[in-house]
Amino acid sequence: MNDKKPNVDRFDPRLAAAYSRTENKEQQYDEWAATYDSDLVDDMGYVAHIDAGNVFMEVVPDKNSTILDVACGTGLAGQYLQSHGYTQIDGVDLSAKMLDIARDRAIYRNLMQHDFTRSFESEILYGALLCVGMFSYAVPKISDMHNVVNCVQPGGSCVITVNGAAWEDLDLGSELAAESSRHGFEVEKIIDAGYIQEQGIGSKILVIKP
């Protein structure tokens, strides 16, 4: 387990609060839900959902694939996929208020609430998975990634972002190598991409096979 304490105060206070808090995350994101899109996209130049969505479309060209959007939030990533013809999308997020906004966008077949520090119990396994913005400084940690990857059927694909600043500050590459070895999934690619442009934060986009 990585016990480093990076200085997240160098970021916008809204991000710093999210990056430093490990307790009551559901409440935190419930309180942020109403302004989340404008804060991130308009104020901070958030592009993670676009860059990850573009990688996803390369990896999963079949628009009839069953897709789980993990940490779907208000639906930014799901909406981007839907705009490119993907229709079989379910969403899951920690925050009920975020899910309410996503529901109003009429993107998802089903919406579920879950904390991925625990295993996700589902009656089905998905053909593919997109997870944008969940793995960063706080929780869930890289050591919880198997809970995400296990949602996808063998032979499927996972496209998962990791906050690039956290990747460097916390040496998350080493944690990922340990997690993939421990749980037997393959990291096929690690792609450098955008994340939050106005904050100078990039991302690592992981392409993973269960």
Where do the model's predicted regions map?
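Core SAM-dependent methyltransferase catalytic element
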Residues: 196-210
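Conserved Class I S-adenosyl-L-methionine
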Residues: 171-191
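Conserved SAM-binding loop and adjacent beta-strand
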Residues: 38-53
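A short glycine-rich, Lys/Arg-flanked "PGG" loop and its adjoining helix->strand segment in the class I
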Residues: 143-154
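A short SAM/SAH-binding and catalytic strip from SAM-dependent methyltransferases
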Residues: 127-141
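Conserved beta-strand signature within the Rossmann-like core of class I S-adenosyl-L-methionine
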Residues: 155-163
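Class I SAM-dependent methyltransferase SAM/SAH-binding core
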Residues: 68-120
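N-terminal, positively charged/glycine-rich alpha-helical extensions of SAM-dependent methyltransferases
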Residues: 1-35
